[in-house]
């Protein structure tokens, strides 16, 4: 029976990937469709992806598939053909090709079965996830941005919004998509007559969010097809003004794609203009935060003097200190409660 999971250490895999000479392409895709047996589908796809030397992160559930992957450039078309042939529901699926990419985004293949491909917290049995808003293409997005009756809603986490967003887009301050959905409904209650345009990185979150808004009585709902990635690509190809400002945060080793030259965020330590996310180098912390080159040198890649001192300790002492310490996914939340207030929309948590 073939091995359907990785058995090599993370460090060894990363070193092997970095030593590769063949170029790679970073691709993301998703599809909401019914998967009767996610476990069997996962195992079959794992073998297919492994045979093509694909790395990345893939989630499967009864509701569909969500993937961010790195594919050897020479295998991209073979991968596309085999994916399309795998299931009729995947035929012709849009593959979002990364914009600012050296292909070194992943070094291991992780494929997991989950309850949902995006954790949404929705337990309403009457919710129809297929009743989504209308798609918008790049030119239509730009037209909507100039429409005074249109509101752009950013369905990404606060740390994604902080480094880049569409002009005048509203932030739904939250750490997770699950937290954002009810907030978006509450914040928009007084604006049901407006045109609601939702967007996210690659389309998966805003597609479901558009269905959720319609489920809650909003009738004028759109979402950007392919998210920020596809919008920026098409706008550039068509010679259109790119109206997204700053950097598009991505969930891989790159942590961001440069969309425009503007730097709209600031170092969380000194306040200098900066939009480069990093994880604290202290293995007992790993806080996600924005750090400029000067502070990176000053704090040796750590988020504080305390972490800097701890990371300099002998490995055994570091392990002793980490023992029993809760060290989950920590994020520096500078923007919670801070909103675009041009509409006087209150934060419902205040």
Curated annotation (Swiss-Prot):
Residues 146-240 form the Rhodanese domain. Its EC number is 1.14.-.-. The keyword Lyase does not apply. Coiled coil: none annotated. GO terms for biological process: tRNA modification. Keywords: Oxidoreductase, tRNA processing. One of its GO terms (molecular function) is oxidoreductase activity, acting on paired donors, with incorporation or reduction of molecular oxygen. Gene3D superfamilies: 3.30.70.100, Rhodanese-like domain (3.40.250.10). It holds the Pfam family Rhodanese_C. The active site is at residue 200. It catalyses: uridine(34) in tRNA + AH2 + O2 = 5-hydroxyuridine(34) in tRNA + A + H2O. The keyword tRNA processing applies. It is an enzyme of class 1 (oxidoreductase). Belongs to the TrhO family. NCBIfam families: PRK00142.1-1 (NF001133). Catalyzes oxygen-dependent 5-hydroxyuridine (ho5U) modification at position 34 in tRNAs, the first step in 5-carboxymethoxyuridine (cmo5U) biosynthesis. May be part of an alternate pathway, which is able to bypass cmo5U biogenesis in a subset of tRNAs under aerobic conditions. This is tRNA uridine(34) hydroxylase. It comes from Escherichia coli O139:H28 (strain E24377A / ETEC).
């Amino acid at each position: 029976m073939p091995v359907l999971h990785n058995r090599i250490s993370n460090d060894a895999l990363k070193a092997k990937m970095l030593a590769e000479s063949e170029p790679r392409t970073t691709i993301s895709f998703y599809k909401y469709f019914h998967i009767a047996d996610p476990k069997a589908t996962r195992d079959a796809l794992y073998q297919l992806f492994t045979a093509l030397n694909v790395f990345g992160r893939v989630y499967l559930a009864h509701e569909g598939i969500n993937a961010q992957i790195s594919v050897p450039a020479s295998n991209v078309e073979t991968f596309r053909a085999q994916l399309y042939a795998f299931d009729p529901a995947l035929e012709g699926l849009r593959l979002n090709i990364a914009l600012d990419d050296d292909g070194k985004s992943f070094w291991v293949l992780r494929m997991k079965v989950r309850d949902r491909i995006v954790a949404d917290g929705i337990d309403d049995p009457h919710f129809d996830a297929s009743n989504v808003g209308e798609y918008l293409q790049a030119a239509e997005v730009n037209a909507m941005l100039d429409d005074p009756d249109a509101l752009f809603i950013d369905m990404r986490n606060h740390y994604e919004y902080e480094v880049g967003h569409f002009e005048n887009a509203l932030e739904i301050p939250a750490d997770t998509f699950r937290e954002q959905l009810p907030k978006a409904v509450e914040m928009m209650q007084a604006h049901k007559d407006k045109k609601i345009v939702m967007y996210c990185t690659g389309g998966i979150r805003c597609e479901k969010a558009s269905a959720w808004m319609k489920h809650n009585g909003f009738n004028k709902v759109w979402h950007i097809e392919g998210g920020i990635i596809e919008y920026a690509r098409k706008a550039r190809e068509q010679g259109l003004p790119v109206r997204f400002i700053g950097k598009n945060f991505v969930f891989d080793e790159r942590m961001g794609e440069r969309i425009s030259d503007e730097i709209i965020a600031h170092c969380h330590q000194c306040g200098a203009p900066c939009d480069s996310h990093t994880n604290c180098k202290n293995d007992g912390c790993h806080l996600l935060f924005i750090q400029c080159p000067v502070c990176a040198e000053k704090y040796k890649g750590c988020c504080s003097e305390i972490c800097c001192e701890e990371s300099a300790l002998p490995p055994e002492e570091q392990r002793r200190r980490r023992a029993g310490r809760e060290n989950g996914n920590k994020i520096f939340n500078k923007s919670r409660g801070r909103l675009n207030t041009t509409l006087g929309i209150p934060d419902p948590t205040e």
